[in-house]
């Protein structure tokens, strides 16, 4: 649609404008026009869209023709070793086929970061960073996942604003993505950097690295980033440039592979407490649905 094309054009222009404030040579191309070979001429590629697939999605069938497995499209060869920053769900899009840990835990990341590693290089330089932080109530959804945590979920956490807008306050705003934290750092080629306000655990990965890929889960265009976040984003680009040629060597092809945390979750879900919580949640969901139905019916009668 015309609106979608304009949105993409505006985002592309905003990224180009912001990056030129920090870097000498910047080339902007549409994701569908990009090829892996193009990245060899640049220190870092920032991927904010879906590139052309090098292998389409396909279904695996048994001898009788029954579908036994679904395989996602592949967008990069496993040999790709150039530094790349992926924005929001793009980390899952380009990463699933090559076993990246930036998988789709939840498309629910909003505008603020928390539980960041303050000592990490992206918060230090080379561009000077100022971080305005404030204590805020813990995201309510985190309490639903308290059984994952070794310590009680705190009532409040330090927050840092990454975006001036978010989907919770601005209807229709693009939503960010967090990756699963479990096993994220079980190999030296991956590191957790920050979490963010989302509907999952307090350690869900909003910013993280796996090999030569850096997942920036926040979805905002630079036009809606805070000035502080723009600087950290630029530092993230510099940081990932260090990992040229360093492909992931521990890959995760099954995003739902069982981990110790999975066992912990199954144990909790078998308790009466979990059942009561689910009943309450279902009742609240049903009540909200009836409320929305009533609103729609009233509009239809007008």
Model-derived features: positions:
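Extracellular/periplasmic catalytic domains that process cell-envelope and extracellular macromolecules
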Residues: 37-40, 77-80, 115-116, 185-186, ...
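A structural signal for well-ordered alpha-helical scaffolds and beta->alpha junctions
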Residues: 8, 12, 115, 119, ...
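Extracellular ligand-binding/catalytic regions of CAZymes and related secreted enzymes
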Residues: 175-177, 185-302
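Residues at the C-termini of beta-strands that transition into short coil/loop
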Residues: 32, 88, 126, 196, ...
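An acidic, glycine-rich "communication" segment
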Residues: 86-188
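Short low-complexity, flexible loop/linker segments enriched in glycine and/or proline
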Residues: 42-43, 100-102, 260-261
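Helical hinge/lid and interdomain linker segments adjacent to catalytic or ligand-binding clefts
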Residues: 2-96, 275-280
């Amino acid at each position: 649609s015309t609106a979608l094309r304009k949105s993409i054009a505006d985002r592309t222009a905003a990224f180009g404008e912001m990056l030129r404030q920090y870097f000498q040579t910047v080339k902007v191309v549409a994701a569908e026009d990009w090829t892996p070979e193009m990245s060899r001429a640049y220190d870092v590629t920032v991927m904010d869209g879906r590139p052309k697939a090098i292998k389409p999605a396909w279904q695996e069938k048994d001898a009788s023709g029954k579908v036994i497995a679904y395989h996602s499209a592949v967008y990069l060869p496993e040999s790709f070793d150039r530094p790349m920053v992926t924005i929001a769900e793009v980390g899952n899009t380009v990463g699933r086929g090559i076993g990246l840990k930036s998988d789709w835990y939840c498309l629910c990341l909003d505008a603020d970061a928390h539980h960041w590693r303050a000592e990490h290089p992206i918060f230090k330089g080379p561009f000077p960073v100022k971080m305005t932080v404030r204590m805020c109530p813990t995201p309510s959804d985190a309490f639903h996942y308290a059984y994952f945590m070794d310590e009680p979920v705190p009532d409040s956490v330090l927050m840092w604003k990454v975006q001036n807008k978010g989907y919770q306050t601005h209807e229709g705003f693009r939503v960010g993505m967090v990756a699963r934290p479990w096993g994220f750092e079980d190999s030296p080629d991956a590191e957790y950097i920050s979490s963010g306000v989302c509907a999952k655990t307090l350690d869900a990965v909003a910013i993280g690295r796996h090999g030569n890929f850096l997942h920036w889960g926040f979805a905002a265009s630079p036009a809606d980033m805070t000035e502080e976040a723009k600087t950290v984003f630029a530092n993230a680009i510099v940081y990932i440039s260090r990992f040229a040629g360093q492909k992931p060597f521990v890959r995760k092809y099954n995003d739902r592979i069982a981990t110790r945390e999975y066992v912990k979750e199954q144990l909790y879900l078998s308790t009466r407490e979990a059942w009561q919580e689910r009943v309450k949640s279902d009742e609240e969901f049903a009540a909200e649905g009836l409320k929305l139905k009533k609103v729609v019916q009233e509009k239809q009668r007008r």
